[in-house]
């Protein structure tokens, strides 16, 4: 809440950018694990649901140990079901924007995470995922969706050596 000046603003997009491997996905997952009062759709274009589950379990155990000093062996932690859903988080491994929008209609989330924007593509643009035109169009479509639906979106994006959003120039 403090970082975002009071929390997620309805209808907004928050871009979390950084170098690959710096911890953007882990930070985001750690944050949404604590948002148990919201239905969250976590869209992953890079990792499998199993990989996300392993990280979430590790984070949940660490957080619980910090809270009450319990050993990791005795903790009840968030666990991923075989369908890919936490209690309040649904994980969708998909890179096609149109399919993501269809899934949003089914899940009716209150927050959406896209990890990462460079992996998402739309049929509206004839270029490869991660290209500047794909990143721009997908981000613009997600912004339009966020504004019309009131659902906040977190976009995770990689930056290059120059410090700009990654993607072919």
Residue ranges and their predicted role:
Residues 9-11, 19, 29-31, 35-68, ...:
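Conserved inter-motif catalytic segment of the P-loop NTP-binding fold
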Residues 1-7:
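Pre-Walker A adenine-sensing motif
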């Amino acid at each position: 809440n403090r970082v975002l000046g009071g929390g997620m603003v309805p209808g907004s997009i928050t871009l979390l950018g950084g170098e690959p491997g710096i911890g953007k996905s882990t930070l985001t997952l750690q944050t949404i694990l604590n948002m148990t009062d919201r239905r969250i759709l976590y869209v992953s274009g890079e990792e499998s649901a199993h990989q996300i589950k392993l990280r979430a379990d590790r984070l949940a155990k660490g957080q619980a140990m910090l809270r009450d000093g319990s050993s990791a062996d005795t903790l009840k932690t968030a666990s991923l079901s075989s369908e890919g859903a936490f209690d309040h988080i649904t994980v969708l491994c998909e890179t096609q924007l149109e399919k993501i929008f269809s899934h949003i209609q089914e899940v009716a989330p209150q927050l959406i995470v896209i990890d990462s924007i460079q992996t998402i593509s739309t049929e509206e643009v004839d270029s490869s995922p991660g290209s500047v035109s794909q990143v721009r169009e997908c981000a613009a479509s997600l912004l339009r969706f966020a504004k019309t639906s009131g659902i906040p979106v977190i976009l995770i994006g990689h930056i290059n050596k120059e410090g700009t959003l990654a993607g072919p120039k």
